[in-house]
């Protein structure tokens, strides 16, 4: 995602570690796809989240079990209007937030055992997103896109906001399919099935 969004001329910062970070800083981040290779050299790359200033949009693409370890650092990325799009597989920590009904605001203990994410990340800044593409790091600084192009997204309360429409437009500008859904939770189950 970072390479495609940066290729559209947007300012992009990435968090990486070790040899991957070193390669990005030295040569840029390369995306290898079936018909083309694109290298983004206009990225800010760091391994220290707190080195970055507040962002307009944060794409949280960590494994669910990795998020709690960085929840304090994520706060540095949040300004008053920052939106965070979550790209985890499975049931997300925010599943019962803004849902209503008898399960409203329950903590999903299997992915957020101590309720840290539930309590520390304001659900008003979260937009849910389901990542269908498959990709892998083939060598430091090189991402191989294997298949898939869909990133359906939606507000946790099912509303059709201007911010989710703007994110969809950004993703589509970068060449992704990004349909806005009024029930993002159903899409989670569709992917899990």
What residue ranges belong to the model's regions?
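Oxyanion-binding "anion nests"
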Residues: 193
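NAD(P)+-binding Rossmann beta1-loop-alpha1 motif at the extreme N-terminus of oxidoreductases
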Residues: 1-33
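Rossmann-like NAD(P)(H) cofactor-binding subdomain of soluble oxidoreductases
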Residues: 38-42, 46-138
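Flavin (primarily FAD) cofactor-binding/catalytic cores of flavoenzymes
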Residues: 7, 16, 72-74, 163, ...
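Short, hinge-like loop/turn segments at secondary-structure boundaries
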Residues: 30-33, 101-104, 143-146
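Internal alpha-helical scaffold of NAD(P)-dependent oxidoreductase catalytic cores
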Residues: 23, 77, 118-190
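Active-site-adjacent segment of FAD-dependent monooxygenases/related oxidoreductases
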Residues: 34-40, 156
